[in-house]
UniProtKB/Swiss-Prot annotation:
Lineage: Eukaryota, Metazoa, Chordata, Craniata, Vertebrata
Reported function: Required for the assembly of dynein arms.
Recorded GO CC terms: cilium
The keyword Repeat belongs to this UniProt entry's keyword annotation: yes
Signal sequence, renumbered to the chain: none
GO biological process: cell projection organization
LRR repeats, residue ranges: 94-115, 117-138, 139-160, 161-182, 186-206
Protein name as annotated: Leucine-rich repeat-containing protein 56
Keyword terms: Cell projection, Cilium, Cilium biogenesis/degradation, Leucine-rich repeat, Repeat
Family: Belongs to the LRRC56 family.
Gene: Lrrc56
Subunit and interaction comment: Interacts with IFT88.
Region span, Disordered: 348-375, 401-435
Compartments where found: Cell projection, Cilium
Length: 552
């Protein structure tokens, strides 16, 4: 409010009025931030953030000193893509040697600008592509940047105190880059081995050095103050042996750069097991490292055993609705579960066939020798279809047997199917326990006639009998069987006899060739319920179908 305003001047205008409304706030109006307990989520997050920034407390704990001014040598391995070093040089004013080998640095600027007293710097295999920012280390005397991707040496001209420079395994390919090192008056030792400039003076398509090229003599001319070149005194200017850029040499160079062979177990900032930065004691043993397999370094090489799981794509039918974002469930989940259950019940028995599961492709098999000895061409085709490895489900066999009975009865309606069975010869066989249990488990709900879910047997043996009238008899085979009521009896007698005939034919088809096909007739088995295996008693619940008025 305006302090010069008083009541003698009248009421204030409405536009200048101030209204204050008190809210029904039960707590303090201006509460102070609460200090979270140690171990809470926020405190952990704050400590992690402090660790990433290398706070003074963190440096004291890692260097195991109370006074950071006593730290002169520090060795650590960092990844600046995940952790920020900040301006940690402010807390280490007397740091002289810093070793960051095997780290990842996007640029030298990640080290800050407060390391002006640093004299020795190791940056081997740090993924550096340039030396921008090296000018902030004005007192640097030794620089080791081997096995990086450095090709430009111009930033080094600012280092007047530089004495030792290691450029082994970099990408220096132009001899003119050596002119920048002329501005380093104290440079005495230089390592250039592993650079293209050692093979040819300038970049070009050829991998061979020009005739008479001697890089040692050329470097000595450009850097006269140099004393040692590639660990050999510069007074020895004899031409080295001719060298060529071989594929093996390039592969070894790149492998060293990537750190796949000579990786040492240095602690990292993101190490969850404790100290992430520490000062190494030279007397402590360094743990040996297990080198990677050579196949991991060579492109296209085989992977070592155990690296991949034996069955990475195992299908789990109990959770195929939750396979991640690759499969989206739309609509009613209840209907989806029912559909999945029906599909699994339909295909699971076929997948559980142990010997021949990989070979699920349907192939026509060869009939057994001498098929002419069989009196029934349809049974010959059925035996060829039920070869081991291609045998379909028991339900498929039951449907085929019922269809065959309907075809024969359609040709001679006055003939009893049991008498036809007597003429063709009785067939008995022992049923494996697995088939009996499978029949007893599935016969309660698989006896509804439906189109077959699998291809029919090959047409070589039954084309003249079954294929001409396949579709008409498929839809009304049970009705034709129901029309046989007067000849077979009424009520439960018909159901028992039909069940016995169907069971015997199914057992014959599932166990291979019959005795009659091999020329050995067997005595006629009993057709009563006692003769059937225990797993087949549920077949007696079949009720006869009322006879049709007329045959189609």
């Amino acid at each position: 409010m305006d302090p010069a305003w008083d009541g003698s001047q009248g009421s204030r205008p409405g536009t200048a009025s101030i209204r204050v409304r008190e809210l029904s706030w039960q707590g303090l109006n201006n509460p102070h931030p609460q200090n979270k307990r140690l171990g809470s989520h926020g405190d952990i997050h704050r400590e992690r953030w402090v660790e990433e920034r290398l706070s003074p407390a963190r440096l004291q704990a890692l260097a195991q000193v109370d006074d950071l001014q006593l730290v002169r040598v520090l060795e650590m391995c960092v990844d600046t893509r995940k952790n920020s070093l900040g301006n940690f040089g402010l807390y280490l004013p007397n740091l002289i040697q810093l070793k960051l080998n095997h780290s990842y640095l996007g640029s030298l600027r990640d080290l800050g600008t407060s390391l002006g007293h640093l004299q020795v710097l190791w940056l081997a295999r740090c993924g550096l592509t340039d030396l921008d920012g090296i000018g902030s280390f004005l007192e640097l005397k030794e620089l080791y940047v081997s096995y990086n991707n450095i090709s430009d040496l111009s930033p080094l001209c600012l280092l007047e105190q530089l004495e030792v420079l290691d450029l082994e395994g970099n990408n220096v390919e132009d001899l003119g880059q050596m002119r920048y090192l002329q501005l380093c008056p104290r440079l005495a030792m230089l390592t250039l081995e592993g650079n293209l400039v050692c093979l040819k003076p300038d970049p070009g398509p050829s991998n061979k050095a020009p005739q008479g090229y001697n890089y040692r003599a050329e470097v000595k001319k450009l850097i006269p103050q140099l004393h040692v070149l590639d660990e050999v005194p510069t007074t020895c200017t004899s031409a080295p042996a001719p060298q060529t850029l071989s594929q093996d040499w390039l592969m070894v160079k790149e492998a060293i750069k990537e750190g796949s062979v000579l990786d040492i177990l240095l602690p990292r900032l993101d190490d969850p097991h404790g100290a992430t930065i520490r000062k190494f004691d030279p007397t402590l043993p360094v743990p040996e490292t297990q080198p990677w397999a050579l196949s991991l370094l060579v492109p296209g090489g085989p992977l070592p055993e155990g690296l991949l799981s034996e069955n990475p794509a195992t299908e789990d039918h109990a959770s195929n609705l939750t396979h991640g974002p690759g499969q989206v469930l739309c609509g009613n989940p209840t209907k989806g579960l029912r559909k999945r259950r029906n599909q699994y019940q339909e295909w699971a028995p076929l997948e559980q066939m142990p010997p021949h599961r990989p070979d699920l492709a349907i192939r026509p098999s060869t009939p057994r020798p001498d098929p002419a000895e069989s009196c029934d061409l349809a049974m010959t085709g059925l035996r060829a279809w039920t070869e081991p490895g291609l045998r379909p489900l028991l339900q498929r066999q039951l449907e085929f047997q019922q269809e065959r009975s309907a075809q024969v009865q359609a040709q001679d309606p006055q003939k009893d199917p049991v008498e036809q069975e007597d003429q063709t010869g009785p067939k008995t066989s022992l049923t494996p326990p697995r088939l009996v249990s499978e029949l007893s488990r599935t016969s309660g709900f698989h006896l509804i006639p439906s189109p077959p879910k699998y291809p029919m047997p090959p047409e070589s043996g039954i084309s003249s009998l079954g294929r001409s009238a396949d579709l008409p008899f498929r839809g009304r085979r049970l009705r034709v069987l129901g029309s046989l009521g007067p000849s077979l009896g009424e009520g439960s007698v018909l159901g028992e006899r039909l069940a016995a005939v169907t069971a015997l034919r199914a057992l014959e088809a599932s166990s291979g060739p019959s005795h009659r096909a091999q020329g050995c007739p067997d005595p006629k088995p009993a057709l009563g319920p006692a003769a059937c295996p225990p797993g087949l008693h549920c077949l007696h619940h079949l009720n006869p179908i009322p006879p049709a008025h007329s045959l189609p």
